């Protein structure tokens, strides 16, 4: 599949200035767990970064995210995603939004298997995914993000957390960029912590 055709099917990718590669953005309004947590004081989702700033300032961004959500139903979505992602060394799933259901997760697993030379990182708040970790491809790191600020999770092989201070993510001290840091993609790092937005 040609890249031009693949981008048309997938509705395009996000290139955030912070990240070392492309990412795929879905509407945070459609997060299954996050939409409930938004109403919970002290939860990470109560101040979701994907529901403010450029994500809401420009209506075209929200419209594009909904087109991407719909694009996942295309019969060639998996192949189209792989056609673009295989050109990337690093890929982040969902700079906004989250896994919608088991079918969505299995499609991501297929894409990872079709792009074995790409390092994939998938942050999620969907706890049910833990039951599917045994079948995940080796080139995919899934980091579970506990719901509350300051909450730690040690039961997953990889997780992340939001903290008020002492974050391990170096991006804030590096002009908001990952630069040469790849903690999030590194399965040997059990927990990555981020400063509260």
Can you say where each PLM-predicted feature lies in the sequence?
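Class I S-adenosyl-L-methionine
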Residues: 1-197
């Amino acid at each position: 599949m040609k890249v031009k055709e693949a981008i048309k099917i997938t509705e395009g990718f996000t290139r955030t200035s912070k990240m070392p590669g492309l990412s795929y953005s879905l509407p945070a309004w459609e997060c299954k767990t996050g939409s409930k947590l938004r109403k919970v004081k002290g939860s990470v989702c109560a101040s979701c970064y994907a529901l403010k700033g450029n994500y809401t300032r420009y209506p075209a961004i929200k419209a594009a995210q909904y087109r991407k959500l719909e694009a996942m139903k295309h019969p060639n979505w998996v192949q189209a995603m792989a056609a673009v992602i295989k050109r990337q060394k690093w890929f982040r799933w969902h700079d906004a939004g989250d896994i919608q259901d088991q079918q969505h997760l299995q499609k991501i697993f297929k894409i990872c298997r079709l792009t074995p030379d790409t390092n994939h990182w998938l942050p999620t708040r969907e706890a049910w995914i833990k039951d599917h970790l045994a079948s995940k491809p080796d080139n995919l790191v899934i980091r579970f993000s506990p719901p509350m600020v300051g909450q730690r999770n040690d039961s997953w092989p990889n997780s992340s957390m939001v903290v008020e201070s002492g974050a391990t993510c170096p991006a804030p001290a590096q002009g908001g960029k990952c630069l040469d840091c790849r903690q999030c993609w590194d399965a040997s790092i059990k927990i990555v912590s981020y400063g509260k937005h």
